[in-house]
Amino acid sequence: MLVLGIESSCDETGVALYDTHSGLRAHALYSQIAMHREYGGVVPELASRDHIRRVIPLLEEVLGKAGATRADIDAIAYTKGPGLAGALLVGASVANALAFALGKPLVAVHHLEGHLLSPLLEADRPEFPFLALLVSGGHTQLMRVDAVGQYTLLGETLDDAAGEAFDKTAKLLGLGYPGGPAVSRLAEFGNPGVFDLPRPMLHSGNFDFSFAGLKTAVLTQVRKLNLTDSETCYQPRADLARAFVDAIVEVLVKKTLRAAREHGLKRIVVAGGVGANRQLREGLNAEGKKRGLRVYYPDLQFCTDNGAMIAFAGAMRLQADPAQVQDGYGYGVTPRWDLEDIRIRHA
């Protein structure tokens, strides 16, 4: 079965073809980072317009790479939500039009499910059940995953997501857009232990997160030491970035390992843009190894939004239960969507 996947939830336009027999056939991605950089963040209207410009050329590129035609497509998957409403509508419109014209099944995919299942694209893939840490610009969640469509929320952020905290800290430190990678790069040159930042909710007794207080602590230090001059204050800013990354990684690592232990899970999946962070990967790998846990990640190119994860998630849903996941034709999108709402009833 050859499944076309279309991703357009925010500022990346992604298209891919996934074959349930041979794996990922082809994928293409266009990032809008350069366009949004001058505004310091994503401008929804500009994002939507750019998706319109890019999606069809990307579709043709992917078909060419795969040596396939539109007639070869067996099903079409698209991101229905969560995300920016206008951006989602672009992908939904193209997917619906293609599915209707070709008479093919249409699968609405939850964006976070795409991230959650993306490590299964790798040759060394985890078996169910596993614990998933979803860390991105808009979400920070711990999920128990028993099968495709069987997700149990164990904990989530009560305010800022981890990626959002990275982006806001980048602005406080006068770094560029996108902020997450900029903070991580600066932190590489920082000295540990110079600043003592809080570890919010580290000992809360549950698996929820909170990063707003950590961001405020960074702001306090920036104002106290007047760290706004990127030229004369380089080392103190690097030290503060290091303290921020150390704090956020410690919270993510310890809560994830605690959740795995308490739920008897030996496999951990890390997905989402923050999952590309080197410090987070090293921390989870080292501490997980001590406890006999395996930690799995998607390829770095699939940590951020992409069409491959949507094509794959759509294919997995169709295989799990075609009758229940087929979406019919319609242009509705769901900008706010709970992952637990998409459960598949397994026999």
UniProtKB/Swiss-Prot annotation:
It is found in: Cytoplasm. It is an enzyme of class 2 (transferase). GO terms for biological process: tRNA threonylcarbamoyladenosine modification. It catalyses: L-threonylcarbamoyladenylate + adenosine(37) in tRNA = N(6)-L-threonylcarbamoyladenosine(37) in tRNA + AMP + H(+). Pfam families: TsaD (PF00814). Its EC number is 2.3.1.234. Fe cation binds at H111, H115, D305. GO terms for molecular function: iron ion binding; N(6)-L-threonylcarbamoyladenine synthase activity. Substrate binds at L134, V135, S136, G137, G138, D167, G180, N277. It comes from the Bacteria. CDD domains: ASKHA_NBD_TsaD_bac (cd24133). Keywords: Acyltransferase, Cytoplasm, Iron, Metal-binding, Transferase, tRNA processing. GO terms for cellular component: cytoplasm. Binds 1 Fe(2+) ion per subunit. Its cofactor is Fe(2+). NCBIfam families: gcp_kae1, T6A_TsaD_YgjD. Belongs to the KAE1 / TsaD family. Required for the formation of a threonylcarbamoyl group on adenosine at position 37 (t(6)A37) in tRNAs that read codons beginning with adenine. Is involved in the transfer of the threonylcarbamoyl moiety of threonylcarbamoyl-AMP (TC-AMP) to the N6 group of A37, together with TsaE and TsaB. TsaD likely plays a direct catalytic role in this reaction. This is tRNA N6-adenosine threonylcarbamoyltransferase. It comes from Ralstonia pickettii (strain 12J). The lineage of its organism: Bacteria, Pseudomonadati, Pseudomonadota, Betaproteobacteria, Burkholderiales.
